[in-house]
Every structure is written in structure tokens, then in C-alpha cells.
């Protein structure tokens, strides 16, 4: 795996562009299990960043619906979803290599075959490697809320990002978000509701109950015990 988690963007003259990122690089130490997974499973399930669009049928060895998860953390819920839906293909993107290693190790342990992972900036991957009109679902679960007002601009859910996601979804594809930070949930709802071409799947035009397809994380279980809320939003591409 290349150590290029964060790559610069360049303009037509080759000058680097400065872009506000929604994450902070926190690599941390790899456990032996994570390192083993990166050394041995990455060559099979890992996807290196490059400037060529992905051919999903070739990547997965079959033509099947594709779900993209952005920022999968340690990968437990992503692996669980891939295992629960073997008829679908899953691609996960995470910028922190310990999480990628943990996800790969879990996938091997669970015998999951329909999962591929990347260790790179998801926005660059979307721009460069994900073909337009190719995804059945995009998942963004518990992104950094950047709760301080001066940091709100770092939140990944902004109109340009949501428009980018829409361009990658097939007609009828769904952008599924979840957050445990109420102010961010309100922000997500405002952003998504302001855009043409999306339809809120909520009957009340705000939030949806957690679908069974999204596993409850350990962090989320702890939050429930403490009385914390979680907000799910699902917006369908309609044009």
C-alpha cells in the first residue's frame, strides 16, 4: 500500500491547490494484526489511488450493485453489511491506515469476498476514480462534526460535495448519512434540502428511522445508553 493517504490537487499549470479538508490525518500505530492485513490482504482487496476511472465489473469480477462507504473507521459495520449482502459489491474509503488494516483483517476473518477498500482522500477518489452514474448507494456514517463554529466549513457535507455525490449515483441511487451530533444533522438536512435532483425519503421530510441495513456501532450503543440521539438522512437521486 502506498503511503500517500493525502495527495495534493493541481491546477492546469501544475500548481498545487489548497483545499479545505474534512479530516485530520491521524495515522497512529498499527497492531500486528493490522500490519499483517495490510501486508497480506491489501494486495487482494486493496485499491491504489490513480487517475483512471474504476471498472467495477473488473474490480469485483462481476456486475452487481455498488455501495460506496466514505470514512468507514475500523470497518466493523462495513464488513457486517458486506457479509449480510453477498449479492452486492461494497467499496470503502478511509484515510487512516489502522482502520484500513482492521477492516481488512475483519473481512478475512468473516470470509467476505465482495468488499474492496481504499486508503485515500474520498473527495479525490470521487472526482477521479468513480464513474458518473455508477453507484447504487453512498454511505457517510458519523463524519467529524467539527462542532466549533469556526470549523463548520470543514464539515464534509456541503453543497459542492453533495452535488459531487449526486453525479456518481445512478438515478434512484441513495445518499445515506448518519450523525450523532444534532447540529450537524440540521446542517445536513439544510444542505440536502436546498439542492435540486434529490428527494428526501423521510415521510416527514426530515429524518428517517435507522434502516436495518445499517448496523448499530459500539459507539452508537454507548450513546443510546447515555441518552444520546442519532439522526439518519436518506436522499434519493431523482434527476
UniProtKB/Swiss-Prot annotation:
EC id: 2.1.1.33
Family membership: Belongs to the class I-like SAM-binding methyltransferase superfamily. TrmB family.
SUPFAM superfamilies, sorted: S-adenosyl-L-methionine-dependent methyltransferases (SSF53335)
Entry function: Catalyzes the formation of N(7)-methylguanine at position 46 (m7G46) in tRNA.
Residues binding substrate: 148, 180, 217-220
Protein name per Swiss-Prot or TrEMBL: tRNA (guanine-N(7)-)-methyltransferase
Quaternary assembly: Monomer.
One Pfam family named in its UniProt record: Methyltransf_4
Gene: trmB
Keywords: Methyltransferase, S-adenosyl-L-methionine, Transferase, tRNA processing
Pathway annotation from the record: tRNA modification; N(7)-methylguanine-tRNA biosynthesis
PANTHER family listed in its UniProt record: 3-DEOXY-D-MANNO-OCTULOSONIC-ACID TRANSFERASE/TRNA GUANINE-N 7 - -METHYLTRANSFERASE (PTHR23417), PENTACOTRIPEPTIDE-REPEAT REGION OF PRORP DOMAIN-CONTAINING PROTEIN (PTHR23417:SF14)
Binding site for S-adenosyl-L-methionine: 69, 94, 121, 144
Transmembrane segments: none
GO terms under cellular component: tRNA methyltransferase complex
MF (Gene Ontology): tRNA (guanine(46)-N7)-methyltransferase activity
Entry annotated with the keyword Transit peptide: no
Keyword check for Zinc: no
PROSITE patterns: SAM_MT_TRMB
UniProt-listed Gene3D superfamilies: Vaccinia Virus protein VP39
Family matches, as InterPro entries: SAM-dependent_MTases_sf, tRNA_(Gua-N-7)_MeTrfase_Trmb, tRNA_methyltr_TrmB_bact
Source taxonomy: Bacteria, Pseudomonadati, Pseudomonadota, Gammaproteobacteria, Enterobacterales
NCBIfam families named in the record: tRNA (guanosine(46)-N7)-methyltransferase TrmB
Region (Interaction with RNA): 150-155
